[in-house]
Structure formats: structure tokens, C-alpha cells
From Swiss-Prot:
Mn(2+) 1 binds at D33, E57. Pathway: Carbohydrate biosynthesis; Calvin cycle. GO terms for biological process: fructose 1,6-bisphosphate metabolic process; gluconeogenesis; glycerol metabolic process; reductive pentose-phosphate cycle. Pfam families: FBPase_glpX (PF03320). One of its GO terms (cellular component) is cytosol. GO terms for molecular function: fructose 1,6-bisphosphate 1-phosphatase activity; metal ion binding; sedoheptulose-bisphosphatase activity. This is D-fructose 1,6-bisphosphatase class 2/sedoheptulose 1,7-bisphosphatase.
């Protein structure tokens, strides 16, 4: 990857965010997702690269576009693997709630873990706690370590947890330490990345979410120098999801074995989930969130707010872009 490609990757998420935001607040989550997928794919196919979707909208027979294994780009240029979520937080977008964004991770060929469509136990923390907190430790232990690493009393720590029934015991344990719970309804990618930045008020992400989004979070945290670990969850009793109503623990283990995952209980570090030499994360806000604003539609322009994190040059770029409409007459500075 080079700087030109990274700029084009930014444009991919910007276009997806704009498309999805056109339906924000209208209660049409599937339609908003479809618009984002179409816009993301269209921009990808204009880029001189040999792109491949390793995490996308589903298997080939389940998704018409951006399916796993789909080739994108012009077919010439560098080989790039993508993990994409064109509309992360579709419910958030549909009801115009905070935290929806268009996101992707990119790496050189073979540089991203091909995560199954499973759940994943996740732990994200700031760079100061990298390698010190551990997903195998209890929440109580990790909160104590986090307090020491950040120099903050436990009762000032904000721990993000998705508001799900499966987290009832986890939430009780966290509250038992005196730390604060910051519940979110959807969209844990932005919450995980926010842990990597001081001043966001987000100190740690704990709990179970989707595995594909875990890879995207890992790519960002690796490039940022933050802590991220993930462990696949294959037991329906733990995941507590209706999506696995027809699956059993044994059936899920068989699926993992077929995918070549020999140790289903393995704890993956960020550097294993995003192992490429060059790793890039790009996100653009659909609605306002922890890290950036959502899309703003104005008479003469559309404004996007985005973030690109890359280990190519060890940079984080917060970008506000003004997309000028044809026949624009007046563009405000902000």
C-alpha cells in the first residue's frame, strides 16, 4: 500500500457513509445498508488494485455484493485484502442514533484473519495497558490493572459493554468494582477504537460482539498501538442469540474445524487478527459518534467526518471533507 491508495480508501468509506446517511432516521436499516454496500463497491472498483473481500456481507450465496472472496478493483496494481462493514450499526442509522459509521480494514494480501461469522469475546484498552490487561483474566483483575496503568481511580473508569442479556453477569462484576458502565446498543468498533485515544472518556471495551467487526477493530488498534484481544465464541448458550437457533455447540465446532481453525479457544492478539506488514483502518461517520461527526447535508455541499489510521507512516488522520455539489453558490467554512 502507498499514500495514494490510503487516500482512495478514505474515499471508499466517505461514499458509503453519504449513501447510507441519506436514509438515516427513516427506519429503513436494510435499505440504508444496501445503499452503503453499493456505494462502497462502486468506489472500490474504480481503484487500480487487485482487491479481495475477506470479511464482507456474507458468503457468496448469501450476499449479492461485497461477499467473502469477491474481487474488487481494476484487476491491476497491488494485492489488497479488505474487511468491510459498509454500515456498522444499521439500527443506529435507521433511528438516527449515535455511533453508526462506514468502516473497513485493509492490508496486503493475507494480512487479515478470515474470521467466521461467529461471535467473539473482546477486550480493548489504551496503549498504556497493552500487554498488561488480558482477556483470560477476570473483569475485576483487568479493571485494577487498568486503573494502575492509567493512573486513574477505579471509580473514574468508563467500561463500554454492549447492552445484551448475555452480559448481565459481566455488568454486575464491573459495577461491583466501582467502575462505571457505558452501555451501547450496537456498533462496538467505534467504542473499541475510542479506547486507543486519550480524552474520549472511554477506557476499556469488554464483552461479546461479532467476530468480523473484531478484526476491523484489531486492525485499527494494531496501527494505533492499543490493546486488543479476541476469542471466538462458539457455544450458543454463551452467545445467547436467536441467530444460532438451529445450531449446536458441536455443530459450530465442526464449522470452525472445516475452516481450518484447529484451536477454537485460542486467544488472538491484534497482531494475529491483522498480521499484514501494512495495515490501515478507515471509518467515516454516518451519525455523530465518539470519534467523529456524522454526514451533514447542506444546500451546496455534503460534509463528512472521517478517521484513517495507518502503520505505513504511523499516522492517525482526522479528516473533514466538503463534497461540493454542482452549481454550488456558497460554501460555509464550517
Amino acid at each position: 500500500m502507498d499514500q495514494t491508495l490510503i487516500q482512495e480508501i478514505l474515499e471508499i468509506v466517505e461514499q458509503a457513509a453519504i449513501a447510507s446517511a441519506s436514509l438515516s432516521g427513516k427506519g429503513l436499516k436494510d435499505e440504508a445498508d444496501a445503499l452503503a454496500v453499493d456505494a462502497m463497491r462502486k468506489r472500490m472498483n474504480q481503484i487500480q488494485m487487485q482487491g479481495r473481500i475477506v470479511i464482507g456481507e456474507g458468503e457468496r450465496d448469501e450476499a449479492p455484493m461485497l461477499y467473502i472472496g469477491e474481487e474488487v478493483g481494476t484487476g491491476t496494481g497491488p494485492g489488497v485484502d479488505f474487511a468491510v462493514d459498509p454500515c456498522e450499526g444499521t439500527n443506529l442509522c435507521a433511528f438516527n442514533q449515535r455511533g453508526s459509521m462506514a468502516v473497513l480494514a485493509a492490508s496486503d494480501r493475507g494480512g487479515l484473519f478470515n474470521a467466521p461469522d461467529f461471535y467473539m469475546k473482546k477486550l480493548a484498552a489504551p496503549p498504556a495497558a497493552k500487554g498488561k490487561v488480558d482477556i483470560r483474566k477476570s473483569a475485576t483483575e483487568n479493571i485494577k490493572i487498568l486503573s494502575e496503568c492509567l493512573g486513574l481511580p477505579v471509580d473514574e473508569l468508563n467500561i463500554v459493554v454492549m447492552d445484551r442479556a448475555r452480559h448481565k453477569d459481566l455488568i454486575a462484576e464491573i459495577r461491583g468494582t466501582g467502575a462505571r458502565i457505558q452501555p451501547i446498543s450496537d456498533g462496538d468498533v467505534q467504542a473499541a477504537i475510542a479506547c486507543g485515544f486519550a480524552g474520549t472518556g472511554t477506557h476499556c471495551l469488554m464483552g461479546i460482539g461479532a467476530a468480523p467487526e473484531g478484526v476491523i477493530s484489531a486492525a485499527a488498534m494494531r496501527a494505533l498501538g492499543g490493546h486488543f484481544q479476541g476469542q471466538l465464541v462458539y457455544d450458543p448458550a454463551i452467545a445467547q442469540t436467536s441467530e444460532w437457533a438451529d445450531m449446536t455447540k458441536e455443530g459450530n465446532l465442526a464449522r470452525l474445524a472445516e475452516m481450518g481453525i484447529a484451536d477454537p479457544d485460542k486467544v488472538y492478539e491484534a497482531e494475529e487478527l491483522a498480521c499484514g506488514e501494512h495495515v490501515c483502518f478507515a471509518g467515516s461517520g454516518i451519525t455523530d459518534g465518539l470519534l467523529f461527526n456524522g454526514v451533514k447535508f447542506e444546500k451546496d455541499c455534503t460534509r463528512t467526518s472521517s478517521l484513517v489510521i495507518s502503520n505505513l507512516d504511523n499516522t492517525c488522520r482526522f479528516t473533514n471533507t466538503v463534497h461540493i455539489k454542482e452549481d454550488a453558490q456558497s460554501i460555509a467554512l464550517s
